[in-house]
From Swiss-Prot:
<dbReference type="Pfam" id="PF03719">
    <property type="entry name" value="Ribosomal_S5_C"/>
</dbReference>
<comment type="similarity">
    <text>Belongs to the universal ribosomal protein uS5 family.</text>
</comment>
<feature type="domain" description="S5 DRBM">
    <location>
        <begin position="14"/>
        <end position="77"/>
    </location>
</feature>
<dbReference type="GO" id="GO:0015935">
    <property type="term" value="C:small ribosomal subunit"/>
</dbReference>
<dbReference type="InterPro" id="IPR005324">
    <property type="entry name" value="Ribosomal_uS5_C"/>
</dbReference>
<dbReference type="GO" id="GO:0003735">
    <property type="term" value="F:structural constituent of ribosome"/>
</dbReference>
<keyword id="KW-0687">Ribonucleoprotein</keyword>
<dbReference type="InterPro" id="IPR013810">
    <property type="entry name" value="Ribosomal_uS5_N"/>
</dbReference>
<keyword id="KW-0699">rRNA-binding</keyword>
<comment type="function">
    <text>Located at the back of the 30S subunit body where it stabilizes the conformation of the head with respect to the body.</text>
</comment>
<keyword id="KW-0694">RNA-binding</keyword>
<protein>
    <recommendedName>
        <fullName>Small ribosomal subunit protein uS5</fullName>
    </recommendedName>
</protein>
<keyword id="KW-0689">Ribosomal protein</keyword>
<dbReference type="Pfam" id="PF00333">
    <property type="entry name" value="Ribosomal_S5"/>
</dbReference>
<dbReference type="InterPro" id="IPR005712">
    <property type="entry name" value="Ribosomal_uS5_bac-type"/>
</dbReference>
<dbReference type="InterPro" id="IPR000851">
    <property type="entry name" value="Ribosomal_uS5"/>
</dbReference>
<comment type="function">
    <text>With S4 and S12 plays an important role in translational accuracy.</text>
</comment>
Amino acid sequence: MTVLKKNEKIKLELKEKLVMVNRVCKVTKGRRYFSFTALVIKGDENGVVGYGFGKAKEAQDAIYKAGEKAKKKLLKINIIKGGTIPHEQEAKYCGARVFICPASEGTGIIAGGAVRSVLEAVGLTNVLSKSKGSSNKINCIKATILALSKLRTVNTIALERGISISKILIG
């Protein structure tokens, strides 16, 4: 996982996916104040993903703000050939736990709701996923991105251990 630099972000063609829009209300003695929150995921379907949470008086403004925040939080994720991940990974954010696992070719994305939208935005095509605990969409997305950011390729593992790649693959 690497955080993208400003000049790298400009070149990307990002696809935006709206996960949720929520109307919230602040009640005072005099009246009720309504506003909107929006959760947006942006990704290039080639290993780059980001999420944003925006708040505004109008729904369109909240969606726009969320999209701009998502552009600022882009991460590069390691994807291996076949559209899957290198190894199993689990992550927890607040009450939400997410477990992602590589799958064989032709399996597709088996995941629910918010987790699925993150995996699609990254560009994964064959992944198994299980979400436990809280079903809060914001926390599930943060846990999924945390799990994806913990993924390591064979090259990084070989560098950390100071041994050759073939020794890791063969054993």
